[in-house]
Amino acid sequence: MISNKRKEIDTIDGHHEKDNDDDDSDGIDNGLLTYKKFKKDFDSGSTNYRELQIIAKSLGLASNGKKQLVYNRIEGYFLSKKVKNNLTNNETNQQEEKKEEEQQQPQPQEKQYILTFKDVEPVENYFWKVFRNIVIFKHIFSNFKNKQYGYYDLIGCDRSYLNDTSNSMEIIIDNIKSNNNHQIIRNKINIANIIHKFKKNDEKTKSFYNLLFSRYSSTSTSSTIQFDENIDKWIQAMIGHVNFTALDQFIKFFKIDSEVIKKVMKIHIDPSVFGNTTYDKLKIYNYLKSINSLPTSHTLLPFISTDLSKFLSFDNKFKKLIKSYKRLIESTNLQERMEQQKQKEKIKIHPSNIKYYEKLNQIILELNEIQTSQFTNDQLNSTIKNLLNHTTPTSTSTSTPNLTITSTASNNINLKEIIKKYYKSICLFFYCTVNSATEMFFRKPLLYYLNFKKESVDKMYERVVNKWNGRSFDHQLFFQSILKDINIEKNEKFELISNVLDNKYVKTFKEYDHYIFFKAVFSSNDIELIDYFLKILMQQPNKIQKITRYPNIGKLIGNYCNLIDKKEILDFYFQNYRDESLLFDDQNEIWKQIQLELIEHYEYLMDSIGKRCKLDFTPWFDQNFLDRLNRAILKPSVYSIGFDGYFDIVFEGLVDLNIKDNKENSIINFLSNAQLKHPLDLKFFESSFNPYKGKMLTFIKFLFNNISKESIETKLKVINLKTDNKNFEEIKSKIELTTTLTATTTTTTANLLSPKKSKDVGCLTIGKTESFNFTISIRMLLVCLYNLDRVDDIIYLFDKLPEVLFNPDYFSIFTNEYCIYGISSSYYLELFINYFIENLNNNTINYLYNCLCIASKKGYTQIFKNIISSDQNSKYLLKIQTKSNQSSLFDSKLLNDIVVKSINSSNFELSNLLIDFIDFSAKDKNSLKMKILKSK
């Protein structure tokens, strides 16, 4: 049997690239194993595991794993091959048809065109004069150093970059079209990250995916990434990342028929994948169903489950609610579902399910009468919350767009009732389809009762508490919703406040719920409600003394002042509760909790009564502390400042916190207007540095703006690096540098207001700063210079002080992958490699190897192509060191590790290049090629 199979397989290598292979033919055509023959043999049990392995190897596929896994790989290969052949045949036919049409069309006569310029701005003429003057051009553009940040290869398609760069799609498009040697997309992981990121269903995204598929397909590129080589894997990835747009365009671009998709679904997609239902999963499910590409095993039911709060969120737009309803109803035939349950009796029908089904069926009939075109665009794009806040129980007026749907005079339906029906239908859908034991997980959200049940607030509270039966009842959501609902009468809100303070709800309240209620009152920012609440509280403090620890209204106002969101509330407290509140006391510290947007108005109120705010160091500070400190420094008439010696240490944490929050200008403003009495220690750089997000770059530019390479050289010279007497502290040596501030580095509004006279406030000297000192480790010094595009300065320091910078305790850490990997472009990495080649010694050989590892892991194929093209470099860099070849630098294991790094990062084009060039043994070559197969 194996020998016969062997004959079939031996013909595969010579035939599996032919375009005329017919996967639907029976048997073996001219000795060629077809998909139909392969599947027939497997299904009949005549193909054993060993034969499957032989077939997989012959097709260039991995042969490891269980029998079913090997079979899936082979079937995936045949499916991709079928799609690829169809695509090639279609393109060939289209080209022939186009050629025939061109031959039939008369050739147009040649015309001469004259290029003229109209309405050219005068300044443009000057631009072209400068642009065409080579001397001026070179002088101007010599100041632009974009080698580091302009290089595509520095970017890569990792998720951090894609998420943090607003124009990442445009950059990828530009890179694909440029077709240069430095490609952003280097491996399948990058493609997967793109599929995970770009999901918007618009023309721009569709066009992007068509460009992507065109660039990376077998008909247009020699890249190792070819979508049509792994049709099954990419369909799996797109469904896994829930990307409808990519999947839709992928199927259309490669003209994948429904039978292929069904087979892929059976092989790779678990039948329950759509069970954990989401809005976007339903879209894919219904799409596959509409193109007849869902196998019978992949029905939405009986696996369905969901987080109902997301479907019914009142923050969703109205049009999303409508689509959610339609997708759920379209996804399954409920009547058929009920009949199946009755006949098969596999799932016992709960009596209430039949009742739910009848109700749902009635609502569906009613909603079918409503067309989406009846709603205005404003309504469809408004959130449910906003629509409900503008609807009324009546439907007699059409003057306000949000009150009623667009309709005839005889069909003026209330929008609130329509929304309620959509909500109710979605709830009923899940009640009909889930087991009664799990019904509690599909309970209507609290906001449903608050918006759609017409009863008093008091009765509403009793209803929802009983409905939740004490389990996870959200008092905060209830109180805030009631107090902020503009459709609820003020008297009912006053009654709620009275009932809470009179302990009417004490049986259902926990102690903490009272604090939640207080917070809800203050967060309403409704002056009438707050005033009513405070007056009752002043009249009966003893009644709630045991319930709350804050019966004093002054403390309550202070503790919840962070919730104030408008000037009118501040004015209300100032005019009515100034004496009771601590908010306007002299030397108070409560001001630190007031929102920054209101702080200027608060300063005005304090200044008007001649009182000052106190700012001293406390162990606690929020993310806006440095901004508040900057205000305090600039307004000495409103603030009194005093810090002890601990602030120097705490300030390092403040700098770290503000960098992580992208508030580097706050740090710069502070250092421009206050002098620390000790050098700023930048040890936090070690943990905060994040090259992907571009954080710290503004701050680093500020620090090193006026620090020359010569001044750095002077500081480095004083470090004692004698090997015979260095100790631990010397190994960890730091250098102290001085940043000189000039008009160009401190041109901020804050500096214009900076106090002219210096003032000592403990560990700080307040006043405009001319310079300040900071300490930094040598390793982070190199990282900062690298980020500032000052690699030329690093190489200058290499030449001047090799005994310092090439000390293993500093430089080896700098060249380690975790430190330099994320910031290394191929341009600068190649500069380092070439420098080390020209200055070889025991240390630089290690650094050279580290840089080669980074280049391999990042997929910098061009660096290795340049090395290979140089006979001299390639002989001792990419050839194995042996007894007969001592000129080579690296042994077989080290070179093997370089290749493995490229394989592990899915840079297979580079992997194959290195495997073919390096003189590995046949055994090692085969081993590395198998690693590639297993990684695909």
Swiss-Prot record:
<feature type="region of interest" description="Disordered">
    <location>
        <begin position="91"/>
        <end position="110"/>
    </location>
</feature>
<feature type="region of interest" description="Disordered">
    <location>
        <begin position="1"/>
        <end position="30"/>
    </location>
</feature>
<feature type="domain" description="SAP">
    <location>
        <begin position="44"/>
        <end position="78"/>
    </location>
</feature>
<dbReference type="InterPro" id="IPR003034">
    <property type="entry name" value="SAP_dom"/>
</dbReference>
<keyword id="KW-0238">DNA-binding</keyword>
<dbReference type="InterPro" id="IPR051904">
    <property type="entry name" value="UPF0746_actin_org"/>
</dbReference>
<comment type="similarity">
    <text>Belongs to the UPF0746 family.</text>
</comment>
<protein>
    <recommendedName>
        <fullName>UPF0746 protein DDB_G0280787</fullName>
    </recommendedName>
</protein>
<feature type="compositionally biased region" description="Basic and acidic residues">
    <location>
        <begin position="1"/>
        <end position="19"/>
    </location>
</feature>
<dbReference type="GO" id="GO:0003677">
    <property type="term" value="F:DNA binding"/>
</dbReference>
